[in-house]
């Protein structure tokens, strides 16, 4: 019987980050996956990042994860979304060469010390006395471990739908994992059923690109990873097409063949990424819908039709596709489909992503009810880190809501749960002005270094930015700028409005029109600073009032977070708490007063009552 410190089941985006984190933290790690060639496969669109998702990738990178580095290495188009808006809601996004992404990740894992890969199907979770002891595979192999991380994506009891046709699979051409799903149920974990879908892939030579809108990458593309240097990718264009009334009529006339409407699909799909038939049904007043035409590889021989997710029959997919301008002769290489799969209700988890009922069992990714590569990778990284920390008898790394989008993601899952695929949005973060993409390295890089996932050179660069920021703000907040003739001429030379009274330099820099190039001319200290430091200084100046407000809110939140709810605390018998509130508190077992306040249905009045009783119990 082989023994490992950590075993990861599933080679998707969550499994990759979990495996790498555990192995790099010195733990003997095994990754079990159904098909080794598909490690790191992009099952849906060939892109990483986006609004809020880009934040997650930057945070993964700051903690020492891999997703951003690989994206930089194999990306074929890079854009910053919402660039004209404030820094809190900007999102980096990259089109990736999905084939090279897989090869890059697989080779990286194969060459990582302490990490082994085995192509098998995990069939049974082994435990004794509510403690993980190992895992069994379809080959009859038994691997012993005390830390098991399940990252199975859509493979748990996966069922693919195309029209009336159904196929048991975790992805087209790959087996689903049926026994493992039952094994999780046998452990007493509450489970549910979700649904997602994917779009058709089209032969490039059958598309008329001349009638499509061309969408280029940014002229000055920015890397995802702080560790990427000398970044100059060769970029490819994407394209935009539109559905029309003919397309919509074809879809409407085939609603009776749509598994989504016939009752064939039972799982709940993602609210914010609906299928094309769902869009036509819900938004019947719209005369067209955007379709984003995205290359799948650098060779651009196959294109993904983003916005065209469907589970309609194959012949209907062909008809509706060929009704779109530019696709009159299009040939489908890979059809779209819907897939149902089992998931574990995430309120079964602690904030460490360890299950409450079984010690040493961690869950990450779509098995927890999320959707998206980035959400999965973030959870995988945290599960791998916390499994390794637990082996060393150290406290888990639990990121707060004011520290990271990863903290928001996990806190939402474990305190509120989800009944539909959960995806990240900037609106979910109360303190999003503090959780920007640009400061992820400053927020989380220290953790990455402590864990041994960030090297000395990278850590030194991060700390230099921190020093530059402090020094720059000191200069701007303390030095005065008078309306002297020389200063007024200086402002005019920068194409800035003049001043009539003495102000600090910070007031000048806080102007919306003030750029990093202008900042370089303001004082000798800024002249040769790196762009990352300058951007930090500019943002802190421009949004200083709002940042201060959010920091005050955080201080109040920390006071509440510090009030811990004792283990095995009895909520019954507390006067003033309704039966509904008591049942929710018992079900979720929040560790702190703040965690209790995050549970849906727990009122501020209930929190006040609970606070009083906790203090009384501690006397």
From Swiss-Prot:
GO terms for molecular function: flavin adenine dinucleotide binding. Pfam families: GIDA (PF01134), GIDA_C_1st (PF21680), SAM_GIDA_C (PF13932). GO terms for cellular component: cytosol. Keywords: Cytoplasm, FAD, Flavoprotein, NAD, tRNA processing. Its main location: cytoplasm. FAD binds at residues 10-15. It comes from the Bacteria. GO terms for biological process: tRNA methylation; tRNA wobble uridine modification. Transmembrane segments: none annotated. NAD(+) binds at residues 269-283. Its cofactor is FAD. It is found in: Cytoplasm. PANTHER family: GLUCOSE INHIBITED DIVISION PROTEIN A, PROTEIN MTO1 HOMOLOG, MITOCHONDRIAL. Homodimer. Heterotetramer of two MnmE and two MnmG subunits. Belongs to the MnmG family. NCBIfam families: mnmG_gidA. This is tRNA uridine 5-carboxymethylaminomethyl modification enzyme MnmG. The gene is mnmG.
């Amino acid at each position: 019987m082989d023994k490992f410190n950590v075993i990861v089941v599933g080679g998707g985006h969550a499994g990759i980050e979990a495996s790498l984190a555990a192995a790099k933290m010195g733990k003997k790690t095994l990754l079990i996956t159904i098909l080794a060639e598909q490690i790191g496969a992009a099952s849906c669109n060939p892109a990483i990042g986006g609004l809020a998702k880009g934040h997650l990738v930057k945070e993964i990178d700051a903690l020492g994860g891999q997703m951003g580095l690989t994206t930089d290495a194999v990306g074929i188009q890079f854009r910053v979304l919402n660039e004209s808006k404030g820094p809190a809601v900007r999102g980096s996004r990259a089109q990736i060469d999905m084939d090279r992404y897989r090869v890059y990740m697989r080779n990286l894992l194969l060459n990582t010390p302490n990490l082994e890969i085995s192509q098998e199907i995990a069939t049974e979770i082994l435990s004794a006395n509510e403690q993980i002891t190992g895992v069994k595979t379809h080959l009859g192999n038994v691997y012993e471990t005390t830390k098991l991380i399940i990252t199975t994506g859509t493979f748990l009891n996966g069922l693919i739908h195309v029209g009336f046709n159904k196929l048991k699979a975790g992805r087209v051409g790959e087996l689903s994992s049926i026994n493992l799903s039952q094994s999780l149920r046998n452990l007493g974990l509450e489970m549910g059923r979700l649904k997602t879908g994917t779009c058709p892939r089209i032969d490039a030579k059958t598309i008329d690109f001349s009638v499509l809108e061309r969408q280029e990458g940014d002229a000055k593309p920015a890397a995802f990873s702080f560790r990427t240097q000398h970044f100059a990718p060769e970029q490819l264009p994407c394209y935009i097409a539109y559905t029309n009334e003919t397309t919509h009529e074809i879809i409407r006339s085939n609603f009776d063949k749509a598994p989504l409407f016939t009752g064939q699909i039972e799982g709940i799909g993602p609210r914010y990424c609906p299928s094309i038939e769902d869009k036509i049904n819900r938004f019947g007043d719209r005369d067209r819908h955007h379709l984003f035409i995205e290359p799948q590889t650098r060779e651009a021989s196959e294109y993904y039709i983003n916005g065209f997710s469907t589970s309609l029959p194959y012949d209907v997919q062909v008809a509706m596709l060929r009704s779109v301008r530019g696709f009159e002769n299009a040939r489908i290489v890979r059809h779209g489909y819907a897939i149902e799969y089992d998931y574990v209700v995430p309120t079964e988890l602690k904030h460490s992503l360890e299950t409450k009922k079984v010690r040493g069992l961690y869950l990450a990714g779509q098995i927890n009810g999320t959707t998206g590569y980035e959400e999965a990778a973030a959870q995988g990284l945290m599960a791998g880190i916390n499994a390794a920390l637990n082996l060393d008898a150290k406290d888990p790394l639990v990121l707060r809501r004011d520290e990271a989008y990863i903290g928001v993601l996990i806190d939402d899952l474990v305190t509120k749960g989800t009944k539909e695929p959960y995806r990240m949005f900037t609106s979910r973060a109360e303190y999003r002005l503090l959780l920007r993409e640009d400061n992820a390295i400053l927020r989380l890089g220290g953790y990455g270094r402590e864990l041994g996932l960030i090297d000395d050179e990278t850590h030194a660069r991060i700390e230099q930015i921190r020093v530059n920021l402090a020094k720059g703000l000191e200069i701007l907040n303390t030095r005065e700028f008078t309306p002297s003739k020389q200063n007024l001429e200086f402002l005019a030379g920068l194409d800035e409005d003049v001043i009539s009274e003495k102000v600090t330099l910070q007031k000048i820099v806080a102007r919306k029109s003030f750029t990093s190039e202008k900042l370089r001319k303001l004082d000798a200290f800024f002249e040769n600073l790196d762009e990352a430091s300058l951007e930090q200084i500019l943002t802190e100046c421009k949004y200083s009032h709002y940042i201060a407000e959010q920091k005050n809110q955080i201080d109040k939140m920390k006071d509440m977070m510090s009030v811990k709810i004792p283990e095995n605390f009895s909520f019954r018998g507390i006067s003033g708490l309704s039966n509904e509130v008591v049942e929710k508190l018992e079900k979720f077992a929040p560790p702190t007063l703040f965690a209790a306040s995050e549970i849906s249905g727990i009122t501020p009045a209930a929190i006040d009552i609970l606070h009083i009783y906790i203090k009384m119990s501690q006397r």
